[in-house]
Amino acid sequence: MTTPDYQKALGRKIAVERRRRGLSQPELARMVDRSVAWVSQVERGVRKVDRMSVLEALAAALDVPLAELAAEAPVVAAVTGEPPGAGGLRLVLSGAYALRAMLDGRRAPALSTLRTKTRKAWELTHAGRYTELSELLRGLVPDLETAARAVPEDQRAEVFELMAATYQACSAALAKLGEPDAAWIAADRAMAAADRAGNPLLVAAGAFRLVFVFINARRYDQAEETTRTAAEALQPMVNQGTPQAMSLWGGLTLQRAVIAAHLNDPDTAYGQLEQASQVAGRLGEGHNEYNTEFGPANVRLYEIAVAVELGDAGRALRAAAAVDTSGLSAERRARMLVDVARAHSQRRQVREAVAALLQAEANTPEQVRSHSLVRQLTSDLLTMQDPPGAELRDLSKRLTAKPD
């Protein structure tokens, strides 16, 4: 039996068992933590299920032996090897740099140098250059720990602000690289440093980073609790028109839209997008407060992501056609292009999907090649195009190649 035949057989089996249990597609989607569009595509044989963990979740929800579903679907092994930069970033979090700083009595590096390196850390994060980021942080984090203990008291708050921003960059990169545990540690350290700096907005920025960890780990209840409470705390400053608070509140509200989309709640998702759009309109373009990149263009990017998650490919592609990404980072542009590829995939437009993925890869090669969603999407595209084109085959090879 060919792979497409397996997909169709599995889809029919799932549909039969779902109806046998008296479940609707939305009910099954909630039980397996997926979108209604995903369930529909699986049942129609459009989307491939090739991960044992997903089959296990479906079997449990449908109350059937796993063997009955596994017999219908060939499960492929996950890509081995570690994304570039991931190991180095984990080592940054593992070093006993605070202890060394307490004991060795070194002089503090110049604050100007620490400021420059912290800005560079975020430049590398926005560019998706994670190997270079890990190399930079291996020196920057120990220097910040030393400075926190060696600078005069009146400079200490700024050092902790730089430390918070550095750990936020580390968390953002690790979340993109599929390292939720390490990303959580980095986000927690960022919030602790922001607290020691006495900077509530920087604490909110740390919460914003933590939410990405929760979303990637599918801990939507924790993600919603963090976004809701942080946004509520910022509301008075938003009402006063404080740009930094507006950016953070807007970023958190966009995250709430994504969470609602994952939970298949379109009314809430689009409602949150509308609220964020209103604040973005007041704020205007050209802001990157706390590296949120919040503004009208970023709201449109999230509209694309939400629409794709809800299975509304048409809305996603219309939004993509209208967005101006010239002012956004390479990382954000690549993320949007992956969502555009997903929308084309939902319409079985393989050539357009591959073109979007290649553009995304050109923007941030490390991020795209290490992204599990991109690998799954490419696998799906391979089953749609028979035989697959040269560009798609070459992309698949790059995604499954073991990192150097």
Over which residues does each language-model region extend?
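Conserved hydrophobic/aromatic packing and binding residues within compact polymer-binding modules
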Residues: 14, 25-29, 39-43, 69
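Recognition helix of helix-turn-helix/homeodomain-like DNA-binding domains
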Residues: 33-49, 74
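Short C-terminal boundary/hinge segments that cap the last helix of small helical domains
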Residues: 63-78, 299
